[in-house]
Amino acid sequence: MKNVAIVSGGYSSECVISLKSAEEVYLSIDKTRYNPYIVLITRNGWTVQGGNKTEFPINKNDFSFIYKGKQIRFDFAYIIIHGTPGEDGLLQGYLDILNIPYSCCGVLSASITFNKYFCNNYLRGFGVETAKSILLKQREQIISPERIIDKLGLPLIVKPNDGGSSFGVTKVTNITQIQLAIRNAFNEGEGVLIESFIPGTEITCGYYKTKNKQVTLPITEIISKNDFFDFEAKYNPGMVEEITPARISKKLTDEIQTLTAHIYDWVGAKGIIRIDYIISPKKEIKMLEVNTIPGMTATSFIPQQIRAAGLNLKEILTEIIESI
């Protein structure tokens, strides 16, 4: 049987969410075909998580570990790190050198999609509509709140250019809030993206390809009790209503699912992805973000959409492992 590393953790605030996703993948993977191991990557080290809180250090020279005197090598890596080094391409580059196949897109695609500002500008070249934005590359970059509002108006969304799970994201409704929002975003990343706020219905759509098929998952409608779908709404029960399939017209559904499939190809994605959108009051489709390693916890969007489609996560994981 293949030894599968379910690679979790990471160096960002999303580490805890990654661990929950890894547990769900571990529970769902077909153990009659694969030997799954949860690998935890942190700044303190790389380890395989054993029973009774035991850990086995990873040999980074060949991505293996020793168990009961025997060297265990991995045949496949299912990457479930949200943020660096999994979502930005660093881990993919390491695995490419070792010739170990993995579940998601490669270095170039990950680099493009992890940088929200670059990804949005790249996709605009294909006609994808996104919010107007300004990128701040470093803390020392000086830009006045007045200039920001003059270009983008109010309200604004201020967020890390390279993060997820809504860490460091602020909705700004007043000029006095801008500088604090920028500082909060810089605490989560090296760049800050300031976007004009787009009112409307927030939705998200999952998609995956294997050797034999391509599947667009049902769309989920997101109704947050907060001003927008922030971290509190994402991970606190009762703060959000998630409706799958979304209560939108068939025409909009078809357009969004088709656009999702196109974006998958345009960015060179692999495995399962999820793309977030806003449907404006004028029924315009505005892309928010491409997630190349979406959350896989029991309550995450992708597992919800898989269930709504009448599909089986165990079978999908097998298809992905065998297709790459």
Swiss-Prot record:
Cofactor: Mg(2+); Mn(2+)
Main location: cytoplasm
Keywords: ATP-binding, Cell shape, Cell wall biogenesis/degradation, Cytoplasm, Ligase, Magnesium, Manganese, Metal-binding, Nucleotide-binding, Peptidoglycan synthesis
The reaction(s) this protein catalyses: 2 D-alanine + ATP = D-alanyl-D-alanine + ADP + phosphate + H(+)
Residues that hold ATP according to the record: 149-204
Enzyme class, spelled out: ligase
Cofactor: record remark: Binds 2 magnesium or manganese ions per subunit.
UniProt xrefs under InterPro entries: ATP-grasp (IPR011761), ATP_grasp_subdomain_1 (IPR013815), D-Ala_lig_Van_CS (IPR000291), D_ala_D_ala (IPR005905), Dala_Dala_lig_C (IPR011095), Dala_Dala_lig_N (IPR011127), PreATP-grasp_dom_sf (IPR016185)
GO biological process, one term: cell wall organization
Xref: SUPFAM superfamilies: Glutathione synthetase ATP-binding domain-like, PreATP-grasp domain
Binding residues for Mg(2+) 1: D276, E289
Keyword hit for Translocase: no
EC number from the UniProt entry: 6.3.2.4
Residue ranges occupied by any ATP-grasp domain in the UniProt entry: 120-322
Pathway: Cell wall biogenesis; peptidoglycan biosynthesis
GO molecular function: ATP binding; D-alanine-D-alanine ligase activity; metal ion binding
Binding site for Mg(2+) 2: E289, N291
Subcellular location, record wording: Cytoplasm
Functional description taken from the UniProt entry: Cell wall formation.
UniProt-listed NCBIfam families: D_ala_D_alaTIGR (TIGR01205), PRK01372.1 (NF002378), PRK01966.1-3 (NF002527)
Family the entry assigns: Belongs to the D-alanine--D-alanine ligase family.
Name this polypeptide is given: D-alanine--D-alanine ligase
